[in-house]
Structures are given as structure tokens and as C-alpha cells.
Amino acid sequence: MTFRIEKLRRDHRVEGFDCGKEPLNRFLIRFALQSQLSNSSQTYLAFSQDEVVGFYTLAFGDVNYEDAPERLRKGGARHPIPLMVLARLAVARAWAGKWIGSGLLKDALARTLAAAEIAGLRAFAVHAKDDEARAFYERFDFIASPSDPMHLFVLLKDIRALIGP
């Protein structure tokens, strides 16, 4: 099974997307393009032919030094740590269990490595919405924040080891 990933455009038809979680559906259908046009975030769609089978959204952010896991703090100054934030990731119900989520995550990680070549980034972060999501990210060696176990991070050096340079 192959799919392609494209940055969200006005002409993409996303209205029929359904991942089973209304807030994610609503974001993609009503707010993703608006957020992208305001440069608040960037959304990428996964397609099987012309069907949207999943999406993810990236934004830059940071984490306070005190809220970061020890591995993120090590070797850095006591300032906020720059991050790429995976703001959203969703897979259409009909495509669940077919590794689309893993493919989307790996694409997001690869784009993060590219962004790190032009701006400072130390890690990639996500706020898992539930235990199932947390377990998904932990399979990719994400580590939890000491202040919130649902805030998960992976260092760029670990991303390189996971997906290559």
C-alpha cells in the first residue's frame, strides 16, 4: 500500500474526513487551512488516490526548562527549549490499523529534521490526548515530561537514529 503526503491546499477536499474524533475532524475541515494561512501551523494530508486517509499538523513551540525531561535539559542553558510540536495527528476510521499513523509520524519527524537545518530545534513534542495515544508515541521512544506524563518528547538525535539522517 502506498500513499502520498501533500501540504494542505485550498483545493483539497477534506469535508468527508472522519477519524471518529469530532475535535480532530472539525479542526481539519474548519480550521486547518485558516491556521496555515495565518502561519500558525502547517497541515499535511495523506492520500490514497484522491481520498484523505490521515493528516498531521506541525507548529513551532518551546518547553520551559523545568518541565522538560532530564535528557532534553542535559547540556543546555536554563532557557526554554525549542521544539517542533505535533499539534494533531489523525487517521480516517476506514484506514485505522494500516500503519498510516506511523507513516504520518515518520513524515513529520523527517520534516522536523529538515526544519532543524535552518532554525534551532532540540526536540519534537506531542501532547497525547489519551493513554492509547501515549502508548503509540512511546513505541517511537518518546519520553514523558516530569510535570505531565501526557507531554511526550523525542530528541532530534533520536529521530536521526530512528529514521536516518
Model-identified regions with their sequence ranges:
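Short amphipathic alpha-helix that is part of the acyltransferase structural core
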Residues: 1-34, 38
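Conserved beta-hairpin
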Residues: 39-60, 67
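Short Lys/Arg-rich amphipathic alpha-helical segments
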Residues: 46-54, 79, 95, 110, ...
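Conserved acyl-donor/pantetheine-binding loop and adjacent beta-alpha core of acyl/acetyltransferases
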Residues: 55-88, 96
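Conserved acetyl-CoA-binding loop-helix of GNAT-fold acetyltransferases
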Residues: 97-111
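Short glycine/proline-centered loop/turn elements that form peptide/ligand docking sites
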Residues: 105, 130-133, 149-156
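Conserved active-site alpha-helix within GNAT-family acetyltransferase domains
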Residues: 113, 119-120, 127-147
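Charge-rich, low-complexity intrinsically disordered segments
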Residues: 145-165
